[in-house]
Design a protein with these regions (language model features):
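C-terminal segments
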Residues: 1-104, 108, 112-113, 125-128, ...
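Short glycine/serine-rich donor-binding loops of glycosyltransferases
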Residues: 118-119, 180
């Protein structure tokens, strides 16, 4: 990850979902369904990430916001963040595929409902949602577990000192163009933008994940350990 080499640069299997003109809402979960039936993934890290989303769901129910509560429940079922899978490989080699969260996600929306849906997606993925300080009063209404994952931050688009790994945007084309223009002027790695129409709730959770594949030479590790230091 982040290094040059001969392997794929765009990403792993989740990248294929970007090539679809249409996709089912549960596309992320279905991607791994067949393999997981044979060998269940390691999901301890995933389970540690879900309490914040569960707290947001319970809060939505207490506020009479059935739509947000339903979205939280669906995201909890679909998210694959924090899961690890051992891949098939040759003897003497162990390959592990892990999905990790994009740590800092900027939420850009003109309505509170869209902002909360974006936040639910970020919590489902295990990251932190960046909100404008103008939404401080709304943040204060959230349960403590959800509040801990929401950071108030202005100028995240233009301030290069602010860590930013992804952007969720609900709005029209003109507003989206302004966001993309600001991001293009930021130094450092390219930050991806997921754009949706106002009111959309089918946020592609895979856009908030990082795919990591780790290969370990178990033959060398179990034999002459000094071989692991050569390179």
């Amino acid at each position: 990850e982040g290094l040059s080499g001969t392997g794929p640069k765009a990403g792993g299997p989740l990248y294929l979902l970007r090539l679809l003109s249409q996709r089912p809402a549960d596309a992320l979960a279905r991607t791994f369904a067949d393999a997981d039936r044979a060998t269940p993934p390691e999901a301890a890290a995933r389970n540690r990430q879900l309490p914040a989303l569960s707290a947001l769901q319970q809060w939505a129910q207490s506020q009479g916001n059935a739509a947000l509560a339903s979205t939280c429940q669906r995201f909890a079922q679909e998210t694959q963040s924090g899961t690890s899978r051992t891949l098939p490989g040759p003897t003497g080699e162990r390959n592990v595929y892990t999905l990790a969260p994009r740590a800092h996600v900027l939420c850009v929306a003109t309505s509170v409902s869209d902002l909360l849906v974006q936040t639910a997606a970020v919590l489902a993925s295990g990251g932190k949602a960046l909100w404008p300080t103008a939404q401080a009063s709304l943040r204060n209404q959230l349960p403590a577990a959800a509040q801990a994952q929401v950071v108030l931050q202005d100028n995240a688009l233009t301030d290069a000192s602010v860590a930013l790994d992804a952007v969720l945007h609900h709005g029209d084309g003109q507003a989206l163009q302004a966001v993309c223009t600001a991001l293009a002027q930021r130094p450092g790695p390219i930050v991806g933008v997921t754009a949706m129409q106002p009111g959309a709730v089918d946020i592609p959770l895979e856009r908030l994940l990082i795919e990591r594949a780790l290969s370990v030479n178990t033959a060398a590790a179990g034999g002459n350990a000094s071989l692991m230091t050569l390179g």
